[in-house]
C-alpha cells in the first residue's frame, strides 16, 4: 500500500491491491501444484487482467494490442540407447541486443531430471524452479523420485492455468526413471508431447537439419556428443540470435553428468578446417 501511495496510484487500485486480513481465505503464496490438491494460485497482487492492461497502451483507442517479445535460442535434446543428450547454446538477447553470452539454459531440477529454457527466461526459470520444489516435496512425501512423465504432466498442468496470459515458454523435461530414459516437450499453453528428439528456439530448424542427417538410436556416447555439438554449432552459425558456448549434459541411469562447455566459434573453426 505504501508503494502504491508513493507511486500516486488511484485510491480504487489501492483498495483492490490491499493485503487481506490474516483470517481471510485469500492467499499470497503460489501454493502447491500436486495432482490431488487445490487449484493453483499465482503470487501476484489482484488487479486488472494482462489483456486489459495491454489494451490501455494502444494508440488512438486501438484495441486488442499485443506486445510481441523478440527472443531467440537453440536448445536440443534427443534419446538414444545410452540415455538422453541435452545440448544448448548460451546467448541471451533483448531484441537485437546481445545481453549475455554465458547463460546456462539447462535447469538442474534434481539428480535425475533436467529442464531446458526457450522463450522468456523469467517464465522458464520461474516455472521450472517451482517444478523443482514440487518434485522435492513429492520425494519427501513418497520416499521415491517422481517419474519423468509425472513431472512433465505437473509442469503442463501448472502453466495451463495461465494460458492466454502471454507466458512464453518452450521447455524440454529430460530424465531417467523406472521406465528408462524419458523426454517431453511442454509449452506455455500446456501442450505436452513425448518423443525421441526435440529442438526449440529460433535456431531449431538448422539443428533439426543436422540431426536428421545423423541421428540413430544406436549411437555410441561419443557419437551422440559429436552429433549434439555439430547441431548446435551450425545452428548458431546460421541463427544470429544463438551463440556463445555449448553446454552439454548426458542423462544416464544413475543421474545426469555435465559433459562439456565449449565455445561454438572454436568448434566452427575446427569443422571448417576439417572440410578444407
Curated annotation (Swiss-Prot):
SUPFAM superfamilies for the chain: N-terminal nucleophile aminohydrolases (Ntn hydrolases) (SSF56235)
Species per Swiss-Prot/TrEMBL record: Canis lupus familiaris
GO cellular component: cytosol; nucleus; proteasome core complex; proteasome core complex, beta-subunit complex; spermatoproteasome complex
InterPro entries xrefs: Ntn_hydrolases_N, Pept_T1A_subB, Proteasome_bsu_CS, Proteasome_sua/b, Proteasome_suB-type
Name this polypeptide is given: Proteasome subunit beta type-8
Maturation-removed propeptide residues: 1-72
Annotated GO biological process: fat cell differentiation; immune system process; proteasome-mediated ubiquitin-dependent protein catabolic process
Active site residues according to the UniProt entry: 73 (nucleophile)
Subcellular location: Cytoplasm; Nucleus
Protein EC: 3.4.25.1
Subunit structure: The 26S proteasome consists of a 20S proteasome core and two 19S regulatory subunits. The 20S proteasome core is composed of 28 subunits that are arranged in four stacked rings, resulting in a barrel-shaped structure. The two end rings are each formed by seven alpha subunits, and the two central rings are each formed by seven beta subunits. The catalytic chamber with the active sites is on the inside of the barrel. Component of the immunoproteasome, where it displaces the equivalent housekeeping subunit PSMB5.
